[in-house]
Amino acid sequence: MAAYKGAALVGETIDSVLSQTLQDFELVIVDDCSPDNTLEVLRGYTDPRITVIASPVNQGPVKTRNIAMNAARGRYLAGLDQDDICLPERLERQVGFLDAHPDVALVAAAADFLEEGLIRPGNARGPTTPALLQWRLHLHNALVWSSVMMRADVARQLDPITRPEMLFAEDFDLYHRIGKLGGIARIDEPLLHYRIHPGGVSKTYQSTMIANATRVLAEVYQPIFGTDADENARLVMLHVAEGRPVSDRKTFSRIGEIITALRGYLVEGKYDQADTVLVDRAISALWWRLVRTAIRAGKMSPRILALDRPKEARLADLKWGDILVSGMIGTVRRIA
């Protein structure tokens, strides 16, 4: 765990680790020169399983997290941010999963949101498979860092484990890098409460995250799209990952072509029938979400339904009521 100006919340996070059903763990926390009393709070814990390291200089979250992971002695590394809450069975469930699946390098878990004391379901509910996660990771960051556990010996084949130049997208980058060394899976039951802060993230954080996540996708897309990798990554990040409405037919068509090309590269002849069905359902849901978002924002009219679309986007999956409501909202916004 990396800690910085976390005095108000880090205690609750630490307590969630101490309350785990699996008690054979070590918790390594690196304080990144916090200007508040975070270090004092950390040193107030006397449990011998907790190791507190005080960084001599402020290095930022990525380097600080790498220090913590390199100091850990266990065979598995579990990620955790200073304000998130582990549910009691998190470590036990993930250790059991990795013990039972030696081909998996990293296992994540579903997460629910914790906002102002209230718990609400996370966005990524539903069953997953390693193949479906691979598909999703080619479109957006599909995993929550604080839910991740990975094999230490595999993670340390990466140098560094997380790259500082990918700030705020370093976890997304890690998933693709470690995915070349072993499988990635997810336990679909929520094992974490991911804290949402009032007011959301800063514009600086958001712009840096988008820029670096786009870089990650561009690297991944290079063998698929060649010279078009950068632009295709930009479009996918803006409209698929960030959900910004598409405003013209040309962009819609290009995104459809990207999805079709990705499916051909990842799925055809490689995924079994069950995984192919899951991916095709995901494509259909994604396409109609893009359509609905564009219409509702007033950027496009319902006539875009006549556009060529990926063959996996089935009309049977289209919720016509949503389209009608979105069309009315979009009309008002265009007039306004």
Language model feature labels by segment:
Residues 16, 31-40, 57, 81:
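A conserved acidic beta->alpha catalytic loop
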Residues 15-24:
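Short, acidic, metal-binding catalytic loop of nucleotide-sugar glycosyltransferases
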Residues 55-72, 93:
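Glycine-rich, basic loop-to-helix element that forms the pyrophosphate-binding segment
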Residues 70, 109, 127-242:
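Conserved nucleotide-sugar donor-binding catalytic segment
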Residues 77:
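Short aromatic/hydrophobic "clamp" motif used to bind/position activated sugar donors
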Residues 159, 196-336:
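C-terminal subregions of glycosyltransferases and related glycan-biosynthesis enzymes
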